[in-house]
Structure formats: C-alpha cells, structure tokens
Swiss-Prot record:
Family matches, as InterPro entries: NA-bd_OB-fold (IPR012340), Rib_uL2_dom2 (IPR014722), Ribosomal_uL2 (IPR002171), Ribosomal_uL2_bac/org-type (IPR005880), Ribosomal_uL2_C (IPR022669), Ribosomal_uL2_CS (IPR022671), Ribosomal_uL2_dom3 (IPR014726), Ribosomal_uL2_RNA-bd_dom (IPR022666)
Pfam families reported in the protein's UniProt record: Ribosomal_L2, Ribosomal_L2_C
Species of provenance: Crucihimalaya wallichii (Rock-cress)
One of the GO BP terms on file: mitochondrial translation
Record's subunit section: Part of the 50S ribosomal subunit.
UniProt-recorded name of the protein: Large ribosomal subunit protein uL2cz/uL2cy
The family this protein is said to belong to: Belongs to the universal ribosomal protein uL2 family.
SMART domains tied to this protein: Ribosomal_L2, Ribosomal_L2_C
Source lineage: Eukaryota, Viridiplantae, Streptophyta, Embryophyta, Tracheophyta
Region (Disordered): 225-274
Localization annotation: Plastid, Chloroplast
Length: 274
C-alpha cells in the first residue's frame, strides 16, 4: 500500500498521510445493508459504548472466513476496498462458477490462483489444516473452533507463526505476542494479511475521523465532577486520587480485564505482551 503526502496548502493536507485509493465495486449478491439503531446505544437510548456515532453509510461484504470450497481452484479477479475493516478483500472466481470474497493476502495480485484442502501446496493464500503445515509457517485467518471459520489474525498486516505440534494440539504465536494451543485440525490461511502500511496513515483532521463513525474523546480531568471522577477543581487541577479510574470509578491503566476461569485458561501458555 502506497502512502501519499500532499502539498501543505491547508492544515489537513499538512498533517494527513492517506493511502492509495483502491476502487470498490462489490457484487450485489455478496453485500447487504446494515441497520444501525443509535450507534453506541442500547434499546432505551442509553449510551453503552462511548465515542461512537455518525459515520458514512456502509454495505457489509460477505467474507468467506471458512474457506470450505475444498480442492476447487479459484482465481483472484479483483482487489477491493472494504469499509468494514482495515484490510483489503479479494473477489475469487472458483472453477465451479461460485464467487466469494476472502481477505487479501500480502503480495497476492490479480490472476493468482488459490485453493483450500488437506493436501494443497504451502503457498500464499492457500488454506489447509495446521496438521499439514510445516513448523515456522506464517499464517492468518486462524480457526479456534473446527468448522467455525477464521477468528484470529484477520486485521491488516496481521500474521501468526506455527511454532510447535504435539499430540492433538498445535502451538501458535499470535500477533499480540500471546502463545496458545489450538487443535491441529483447525484450518488457517498461509501468508500475511495485506495492507501492511495501514498504521502509517494519518487522517489529518477531525472530519475524517467522524466519517469513520468515531466521536471526539474528552479527558476526564477537564470535565465537571458530575461527569467524571477526575473532574472538578480550580483551574488546571490534578485528578485528586492515588490512581486513575474509569468514568464509573473502577481502576484504570493496568487492571486486568480478562474474565477469570475462562475455558481457554489452560490453552494460553504465555500472556500477550504489552
């Protein structure tokens, strides 16, 4: 992905760094509309997720995370922009006439062929079970539950690594640094997710953030006491506490938020690095 810098004629162009445009002309049978009823609010209209609202209308693209078209070769026809994720997507034409969207693997170009199955080549974009992959393989779109479809390493530039296989489980190192066990029968896609340079983008202005459906974020220390525990005081005042807290009074910045006694506690060998 190419990053474009513009002539500094306005503050937004001075601070902005935008990605090269990828056209999107989605197929009608692979999209459907989404009904957003009060973004960030529950059925009573109460804000349950702050800093959400507005944004441009989107059509959801149906992505094939399962990759269950076994032993049928497909060809990459287009590489398109998807407003619902930061990775690009590819339109695949399979040999039996079916058409599906998949995540764009890094380095894949129009005209490349892909396939999924049990005895397929270890090639970028191919999907196969972990038991058939050699150690050290870079993978993405990884299943946690057999047949449910890929759930891990799906963001732009994400890549995991297969580091061990023992018994019925395979050991993976995830993009977050977490090391965990997954069934060897689960499938994954070879390679890294494309659009690696997405973190180099700079929106440059507040309006671009609003187009994404994200509202402004206000610090608690500049609020009133009725709005935040950090608020109040004369002029620029400290938070008045030993440690920072959330707007609801719970400890913030360092408190572990993972639920205790989850089923996957025994599957995680090393916590993610911060």
């Amino acid at each position: 992905m190419a990053i474009h810098l513009y002539k500094t004629s306005t503050p937004s162009t001075r601070n902005g760094a935008v990605a090269s445009q990828v056209k999107s002309n989605p197929r009608n049978n692979l999209i459907y509309g989404q009904h957003h009823c009060g973004k960030g609010r529950n059925a009573r209209g109460i804000i349950t997720a702050r800093h959400r609202g507005g944004g441009h209308k989107r059509l959801y693209r149906k992505i094939d995370f399962r990759r269950n078209a076994k032993d049928i070769y497909g060809r990459i026809v287009t590489i398109e922009y998807d407003p619902n994720r930061n990775a690009y997507i590819c339109l695949i034409h399979y040999g039996d006439g079916e058409k599906r969207y998949i995540l764009h693997p890094r380095g894949a170009i129009i005209g490349d062929t892909i396939v999924s199955g049990t005895e397929v080549p270890i090639k970028m974009g191919n999907a196969l079970p972990l038991t058939d992959m050699p150690l050290g393989t870079a993978i993405h779109n990884i299943e946690i539950t057999l047949g449910k479809g890929g759930q891990l390493a799906r963001a732009a530039g994400a890549v995991a690594k297969l580091i061990a296989k023992e018994g019925k489980s395979a050991t993976l190192k995830l993009p977050s640094g977490e090391v965990r066990l997954i069934s060897k029968n689960c499938s994954a896609t070879v390679g890294q997710v494309g659009n690696v340079g997405v973190n180099q983008k700079s929106l440059g202005r507040a309006g671009s953030k609003c187009w994404l459906g994200k509202r402004p974020v206000v610090r608690g220390v500049v609020m009133n006491p009725v709005d935040h525990p950090h608020g109040g005081g004369e002029g620029r005042a400290p938070i008045g506490r030993k440690k920072p807290v959330t707007p609801w009074g719970y400890p913030a910045l360092g408190r572990r938020t993972r639920k205790r006694k989850k089923y996957s506690e025994t599957l995680i060998l090393r916590r993610r690095s911060k």
